[in-house]
Structure formats: C-alpha cells, structure tokens
C-alpha cells in the first residue's frame, strides 16, 4: 500500500511529507517541506528566516530514525510557531501592514506607546 502525503497545518506553518517538483508537492517518505507564513502576515528578514530554518532542520535531526507521523509533524509545527512568536516579541520579526487581514494573531505589536 502506498503511503499518503501527511501534513501539519498551523496558522503560520505548514509541513508536508513531500518535496516540491515542478512547483507541485510530490509525496516523499524521507523529505519534509516547510511552507512558512503562507498568508504573508509577517515581514521576514534573512536572519529570522535563517533561525526558522535552523530550528526546523534541528527538529528533523532530533527525530532521525523515527516515523514522521501526524503527531510528530504537529510537534514540529508547534515548536516553529513558538519560535515565530519569540522572534516577534523580541523585535526580530514584524507584522506586515500590507497583509490581507491584520488580526495580530500573535499579539499586539510592541511599540513605545504600548510599553
């Protein structure tokens, strides 16, 4: 029986047991693809993207040899969400004012008026 593509979806993180081939997701049992901030809610800089990628790669290495089931994918997604919130709270990431919907899903931005 052929395995199905698994995915874990949070508001800002989507993880698939797949690789991108010709701009399409193709199931791959040994690869994960990260779709970060699909709604463009944040403004990303190179440093914050590198931190996310390092964390993602580290979480994958921690799970080497384990089955990547729905539960493990959700745990990875939750940890990435936590890092996004940390980066936002520490000013290393900011909301995108041109986002389709401005809902401050990770809390209100820290400004001098709020502090």
Curated annotation (Swiss-Prot):
GO CC annotation: plasma membrane-derived thylakoid membrane
Keyword DNA-binding among UniProt keywords: no
GO molecular function, one term: quinone binding
Pfam family membership, one: NdhM
Top-level class of the enzyme under EC nomenclature: translocase
The enzyme's E.C. designation: 7.1.1.-
Translocase listed as a keyword: yes
Membrane topology designation: Peripheral membrane protein
Location relative to the cell: Cellular thylakoid membrane
Signal peptide per UniProt: none
Catalytic activity: a plastoquinone + NADH + (n+1) H(+)(in) = a plastoquinol + NAD(+) + n H(+)(out); a plastoquinone + NADPH + (n+1) H(+)(in) = a plastoquinol + NADP(+) + n H(+)(out)
Keywords, alphabetical: Membrane, NAD, NADP, Plastoquinone, Quinone, Thylakoid, Translocase, Transport
Function of the molecule: NDH-1 shuttles electrons from an unknown electron donor, via FMN and iron-sulfur (Fe-S) centers, to quinones in the respiratory and/or the photosynthetic chain. The immediate electron acceptor for the enzyme in this species is believed to be plastoquinone. Couples the redox reaction to proton translocation, and thus conserves the redox energy in a proton gradient. Cyanobacterial NDH-1 also plays a role in inorganic carbon-concentration.
HAMAP family the UniProt entry points to: NDH1_NDH1M
Family affiliation: Belongs to the complex I NdhM subunit family.
Quaternary assembly: NDH-1 can be composed of about 15 different subunits; different subcomplexes with different compositions have been identified which probably have different functions.
Protein name per UniProt: NAD(P)H-quinone oxidoreductase subunit M
Taxonomic path: Bacteria, Bacillati, Cyanobacteriota, Cyanophyceae, Synechococcales
């Amino acid at each position: 029986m052929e395995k199905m593509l698994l995915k874990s979806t949070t508001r800002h993180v989507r993880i698939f047991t797949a690789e991108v081939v010709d701009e399409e997701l193709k199931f791959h049992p040994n690869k994960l693809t990260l779709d970060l901030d699909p709604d463009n809610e944040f403004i990303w800089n190179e440093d914050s993207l590198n931190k996310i990628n390092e964390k993602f790669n580290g979480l994958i290495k921690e799970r080497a040899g384990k089955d990547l089931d729905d539960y493990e994918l959700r745990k990875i997604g939750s940890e990435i969400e936590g890092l996004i919130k940390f980066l936002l709270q520490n000013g290393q990431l900011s909301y995108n004012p041109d986002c389709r919907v401005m809902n401050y899903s990770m809390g209100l931005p820290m400004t001098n008026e709020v502090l």
